[in-house]
A protein has these predicted regions:
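Generic extreme N-terminus detector
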Residues: 4-5, 194
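Bacterial N-terminal signal peptides
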Residues: 5-15
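Extracytoplasmic/lumenal domain signature
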Residues: 18-262
Length: 262
């Protein structure tokens, strides 16, 4: 059974898209103690990992919704978990920390303390590095096995989640209105692009390396991933805080606070 997760006010719903007698039939629901604002991630064996405002990270059986384990952090978990090649679950918390958890048991492998709240979701590089931002104005690269800091770069408060290009370049937006491209090995800035509003949208990367993202200036941008040069911009009727996706035929889909999807 393939599971399509849907978030509800204080829990997680799973709707079956493979075996339901009716489209969108609810397969199961799991209730947490507080709203769920994190997006679920699916690991090996179909386990669903998700964070909650109740300060916990949950691992759920993807077929039944039964809880496998929970891990308590010191703050709300708004960050969406990322899963390493070995099954390790990486997630940030409002308690200023980044956690690495054993995907099978939920036992903590390590934690890393940043200087402020972590809303950003991690991205995992080809070498296993965990890239994540904090509201302390910095983007961090951590060793996925040990949690040791490899590099950190000051770029402004990071509410956006980073994306990693095929060449290892890290792209991330900041509340300082800029999108940054950083060298994934060193954290050195390659280029930056300024918009007219804060960026909470996480970048999407096309097959040709084009970087797409939205801004609170109501626009969707397309930038050359190598140079940062603007290819085009599209103005919507409202803030673009959601993250775009790139579909077949290089079609870009994005939502806006003008109540429309483009």
């Amino acid at each position: 059974m393939r599971i399509l997760p849907l978030i509800w006010i204080s829990g997680i719903l799973a709707s079956s898209v493979a075996e339901a007698s009716e489209p969108g039939e609810v397969a199961w629901g799991f209730e947490t103690a507080s709203p769920v604002r994190s997006s679920p991630s699916i690991g090996g064996g179909g386990t669903v990992y998700v964070g909650s405002v109740d300060k916990k990270v949950y691992a759920l059986n993807g077929a039944t919704g039964e809880k496998k384990w929970e891990f308590v952090t010191g703050g709300e978990v708004l960050s969406s978990p990322a899963i390493g090649s070995d099954g390790t679950v990486y997630v940030g918390s409002v308690d200023k920390k980044v956690y690495a958890l054993n995907g099978e048991s939920g036992i903590k492998k390590w934690e890393f303390l940043t200087g402020d709240k972590v809303y950003s979701s991690p991205a995992i590089g080809k070498d296993g590095s965990v890239i994540i931002g904090s509201l302390d104005d910095h983007l961090y690269a951590l060793d996925g096995r040990t949690g040791v800091k490899k590099w950190t770069t000051k770029i402004g408060d990071v509410g956006s989640s980073p994306s990693i290009g095929l060449d290892g370049t890290v792209y991330v937006g900041s509340l300082d209105t800029k999108l940054y491209a950083l060298d994934g090995k060193t954290g050195e800035k390659k280029w930056e692009f300024k918009t007219q509003g804060r960026i909470g949208s996480s970048p999407a990367i096309g097959l040709d390396g084009t970087v797409y993202f939205g801004s609170v200036d109501d626009k969707l941008y397309a930038l050359d991933g190598q140079t940062g040069a603007k290819k085009w911009e599209f103005k919507t009727g409202g803030n673009v805080e959601g993250s775009p996706v790139v579909g077949p035929g290089n079609v870009v889909y994005v939502g806006s606070e003008d109540k429309k999807v483009y």
